[in-house]
């Protein structure tokens, strides 16, 4: 009997741990505990650890309300962990629960997903379906920053500025970022004083100190504060010689040297710009480099650089052609000079340059013409009619008189004089001589009536 009782007790003792273990396991994997564990981990932002518990809970087929909450935490965790299927999961959740109280946040998460993928129009559409003011403070600020950036990326700068301004006033976290983008927007809008005001405090900020000096220097150059532009550019190049903005800083430095009349330094700076900028260089930089070469008497380089400027019909092109012509004259390439002057004279962008170019064009024609009485006379006539009060008018008149008297083409000379609206005293004196010569020729040819007319006009 005692033996039997002992066996029963032994059996009970052996089975007790198994029963206790089963009860503990059931307690741990019960739907309530799985939900509680998953939710706690989710609230602690331990998303990777929350997912297994929440997935296990969903498999238990819980009540509809708890299932909706659990699946919300699962898709939110997928977003936070940058799951490659996060957009699909978020949209599927909205399809399953169109009336979910979490819809506002889900839309904001979807918008954020599209923002990070660079799909700014899609992101904006979803942000417009979201009430950002209903989100938590930190998330509200994050989404507001994304919304403002989306507007900027889609060129709606007015809306972008409104949202950046709003965020800057309420979020210390994004204050400097907002200041930078507001300054950038003002810069693109050519509101340079406002832009400069926001750029300047960011010069020592670790995130922006290698970026904002470019805009600061550029604004100083635009406002013709070349001394300040020079200082900013020099300091930047000393600190960041290989930065992506170094090329532009060399350009700005060249701009400053050019306007200081320090042409050798300008050539060096602009050369640094061209050596580092492998995209299409700016026309104004090529123009200033070309004129710097001209001022330093490197005429071949001047013509080469200025030739790259003449892509648009404007004042820059007109002056580039003029100085190309002047450079070619120094290189004794008169035909190239003539063609360049002709192009400059054809433009009315700047009448003073047009006048100088027209004079040089006529002079080149005169010096290169194979015909003694040809295109040069026509060019001189045109010049005197267009610029009768020009300081070059006397020289042009003298050239014409020289041609009239040396070629002995008196009838052609007379017609030429008659085409000049306001002939100078020199030309009128030449006209008298020409009429006398025509009169004597007619008399010698026994054309006495014609001779009398010419001689009477010559008196």
Regions of interest found by a model, annotated:
Residues 2-5, 20-459:
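Acidic, polar-rich low-complexity tracts and alpha-helical solenoid repeat scaffolds
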Residues 10-17:
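Bacterial N-terminal signal peptides
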């Amino acid at each position: 009997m005692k033996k039997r009782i002992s066996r029963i007790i032994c059996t009970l003792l052996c089975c007790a741990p198994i029963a206790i273990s089963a009860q503990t396991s059931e307690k741990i994997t019960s739907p309530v505990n799985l939900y509680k564990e998953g939710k706690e981990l989710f609230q602690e932002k331990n998303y990777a650890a929350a997912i297994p518990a929440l997935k296990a809970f969903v498999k238990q087929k819980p009540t509809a309300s708890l299932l909706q909450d659990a699946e919300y935490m699962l898709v939110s965790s997928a977003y936070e962990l940058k799951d490659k299927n996060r957009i699909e999961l978020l949209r599927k959740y909205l399809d399953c629960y169109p009336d979910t109280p979490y819809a506002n946040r889900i839309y904001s998460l979807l918008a954020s997903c599209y923002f990070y993928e660079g799909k700014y129009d899609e992101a904006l559409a979803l942000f417009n379906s979201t009430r950002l003011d209903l989100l938590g403070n930190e998330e509200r600020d994050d989404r507001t920053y994304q919304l403002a950036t989306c507007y900027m990326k889609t060129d709606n700068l007015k809306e972008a500025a409104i949202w950046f301004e709003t965020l800057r006033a309420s979020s210390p976290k994004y204050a400097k970022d907002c200041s930078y983008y507001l300054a950038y927007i003002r810069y693109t809008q050519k509101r340079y004083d406002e832009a400069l005001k926001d750029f300047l405090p960011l010069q020592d900020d670790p995130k922006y100190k290698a970026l904002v000096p470019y805009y600061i220097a550029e604004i100083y150059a635009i406002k013709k504060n070349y001394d300040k532009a020079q200082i900013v550019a020099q300091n930047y190049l000393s600190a960041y010689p290989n930065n992506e903005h170094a090329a532009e800083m060399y350009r700005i430095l060249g701009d400053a040297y050019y306007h200081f009349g320090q042409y050798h330094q300008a050539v060096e700076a602009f050369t640094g710009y061209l050596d580092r900028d492998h995209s299409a260089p700016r026309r104004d930089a090529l123009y200033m480099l070309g004129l710097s070469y001209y001022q330093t008497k490197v005429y071949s380089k001047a013509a080469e650089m200025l030739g790259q400027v003449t892509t648009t019909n404007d004042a820059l092109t007109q002056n580039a052609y003029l100085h190309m012509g002047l450079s070619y004259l120094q290189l004794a390439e008169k035909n190239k000079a003539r063609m360049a002057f002709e192009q400059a004279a054809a433009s009315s962008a700047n009448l003073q340059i047009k006048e100088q170019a027209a004079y040089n064009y006529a002079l080149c024609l005169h010096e290169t013409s194979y015909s003694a009485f040809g295109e040069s006379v026509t060019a001189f006539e045109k010049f005197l009619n267009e610029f009768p009060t020009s300081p070059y008018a006397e020289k042009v008149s003298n050239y014409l008189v020289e041609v009239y008297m040396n070629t002995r083409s008196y009838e052609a000379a007379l017609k030429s004089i008659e085409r000049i609206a306001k002939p100078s005293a020199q030309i009128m004196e030449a006209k008298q001589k020409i009429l006398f010569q025509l009169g004597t020729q007619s008399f010698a040819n026994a054309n006495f009536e014609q001779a009398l007319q010419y001689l009477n006009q010559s008196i």
